[in-house]
């Protein structure tokens, strides 16, 4: 690739988190870079070393991130390149906030580019999985069929006892509704079993031969009612909140250009390249996104799979939240946030609260606007409380999410 000519200005997309200090969570102030390559505010690093929270026995001047460092205290110098970037970012942010609306973009960029979803499974794999599922259904139906004779004999015995104990001369006719129902059910099970076995044979033939056409696979799946999206896991709603469970969807208007969403708008991924979405004041300048659904009353519950994201935040925010601020750093947003080992925290009313538990694989979010309550749970077989706070907003609240923008491929998924 040809290099840019000297003096050529190359646009670079930066967010506050790209130039922030992991210690104070703010923009770098007098940035200094350690030999390992990690940068921090000079004073933040000094204070941390003095408090001995970053050091280890063998290396008291360790980097707070990678825990590497020299045995002797290093001389800290200002990083002029980083300082220049921070100054330019701060000035650009002020101009963007106070300046006029930018000129209209070309029409070709007015519509967000549909996110490309990578196909992870071949048709053969899908057919093989369907074959296994149908096989399980066949076993279930056969099991039910074997249980029918015992049920029938139990029914006959019960009818016989009733007949002997009855003081009247009433008898159960051969066309008793109970007996007719049993006969019809038995016939229906046999029909279902025959249909399933035919489908099973067809699927097995497709696996051993060439890949079945997509339309044929869809028709076979539809005939037995097997229509789950193989890419997305089945939702695990905590039983305590099942009556209020929802599956909100991401709002494309607020979606950062660093992010992409899946076709069903329930998975958000850190993009490997900046997306050419149409610019508007509703779009986040950092790696965040809101959901389309807004809540101003009642109770709602949803779950988020965080297993495939190294740094994330999950919470709620009003639509009017500033688009250059992170969740929890405004008066109208609340969240829990995971930034790596020993960096699990909650943010409410612009205040940080450290959380002692480890990162949850699935986060359950309970929003009770009648009581003004927001609670987060770690969801496995049952929900375990993580954090609870009060919420108060004059505007409806939306589910809100943040992903670390420098880890392409990381994603969060609403279950």
From Swiss-Prot:
A GO molecular function held by the record: ubiquitin protein ligase activity
The protein's predominant localisation is cytoplasm
Checking SUPFAM superfamilies in the record gives:
Concanavalin A-like lectins/glucanases (SSF49899), RING/U-box (SSF57850)
Alphabetized, the UniProt keywords read: Coiled coil, Cytoplasm, Immunity, Innate immunity, Metal-binding, Transferase, Ubl conjugation pathway, Zinc, Zinc-finger
**CDD domains linked to this entry:** SPRY_PRY_RNF135
According to the entry, every stretch annotated as the B30.2/SPRY domain falls at: 228-415
Enzyme type, top EC level? transferase
Q: Where in the cell is it found?
A: Cytoplasm; Cytoplasm, Stress granule
Q: How does it assemble?
A: Homodimer. Interacts (homodimer) with RIGI (double-stranded RNA-bound oligomeric form); involved in both RIGI ubiquitination, oligomerization into filaments associated with viral RNAs and the bridging of these filaments. Interacts with UBE2D3 and UBE2N; E2 ubiquitin ligases involved in RNF135-mediated ubiquitination of RIGI and activation of the RIG-I signaling pathway. Interacts with PCBP2.
Query: What is its biological role?
Result: E2-dependent E3 ubiquitin-protein ligase that functions as a RIGI coreceptor in the sensing of viral RNAs in cell cytoplasm and the activation of the antiviral innate immune response. Together with the UBE2D3, UBE2N and UB2V1 E2 ligases, catalyzes the 'Lys-63'-linked polyubiquitination of RIGI oligomerized on viral RNAs, an essential step in the activation of the RIG-I signaling pathway. Through a ubiquitin-independent parallel mechanism, which consists in bridging RIGI filaments forming on longer viral RNAs, further activates the RIG-I signaling pathway.
The name on file for this protein is E3 ubiquitin-protein ligase RNF135
- Recorded source organism is Rattus norvegicus
């Amino acid at each position: 690739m040809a290099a840019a000519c000297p003096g050529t200005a190359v646009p670079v997309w930066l967010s506050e988190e790209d130039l922030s200090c992991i210690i104070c969570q703010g923009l770098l102030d007098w940035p200094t870079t350690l030999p390992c390559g990690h940068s921090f505010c000079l004073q933040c690093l000094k204070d941390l070393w003095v408090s001995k929270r970053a050091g280890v026995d063998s290396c008291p001047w360790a980097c707070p991130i990678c825990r590497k460092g020299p045995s002797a205290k290093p001389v800290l110098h200002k990083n002029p390149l980083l300082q220049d970037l921070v100054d330019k970012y701060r000035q650009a942010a002020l101009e963007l906030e106070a300046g006029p609306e930018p000129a209209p973009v070309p029409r070709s960029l007015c519509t967000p580019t549909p996110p490309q979803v990578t196909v992870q499974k071949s048709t053969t794999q899908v057919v093989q999985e369907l074959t296994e599922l149908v096989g399980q259904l066949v076993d279930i139906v056969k099991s039910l069929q074997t249980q029918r004779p015992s049920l029938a004999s139990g029914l006959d015995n019960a009818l016989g006892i009733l007949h002997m104990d009855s003081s009247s001369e009433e008898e159960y006719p051969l066309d008793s509704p109970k007996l007719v129902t049993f006969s019809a059910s038995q016939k229906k099970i046999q029909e279902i079993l025959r249909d399933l076995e035919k489908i099973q044979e067809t699927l097995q033939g497709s696996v051993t031969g060439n890949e079945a056409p997509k339309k044929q696979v869809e028709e076979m799946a539809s005939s037995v009612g097997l229509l789950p999206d193989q890419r997305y896991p089945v939702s695990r709603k905590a039983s305590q909140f099942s009556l209020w469970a929802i599956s909100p969807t991401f709002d494309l208007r607020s979606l950062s250009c660093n992010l992409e969403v899946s076709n069903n708008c329930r998975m958000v991924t850190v993009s490997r390249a900046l997306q050419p979405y149409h610019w508007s004041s509703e779009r986040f300048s950092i790696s965040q996104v809101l959901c389309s659904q807004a809540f101003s009353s009642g109770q709602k519950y949803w779950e988020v799979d965080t297993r495939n994201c190294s740094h994330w935040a999950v919470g709620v925010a009003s639509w009017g939240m500033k688009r250059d601020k992170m969740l929890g750093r405004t008066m109208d947003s609340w969240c829990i946030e995971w930034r790596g080992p020993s960096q699990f925290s909650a943010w409410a009313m612009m205040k940080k609260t450290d959380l002692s538990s480890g990162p949850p694989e699935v986060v359950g979010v309970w929003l009770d606007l009648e009581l003004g309550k927001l609670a987060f749970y770690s969801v496995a077989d049952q929900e375990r409380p993580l954090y609870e706070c009060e919420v108060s907003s004059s505007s409806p609240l939306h589910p809100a999410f943040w992903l670390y923008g420098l880890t392409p491929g990381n994603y969060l998924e609403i279950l």
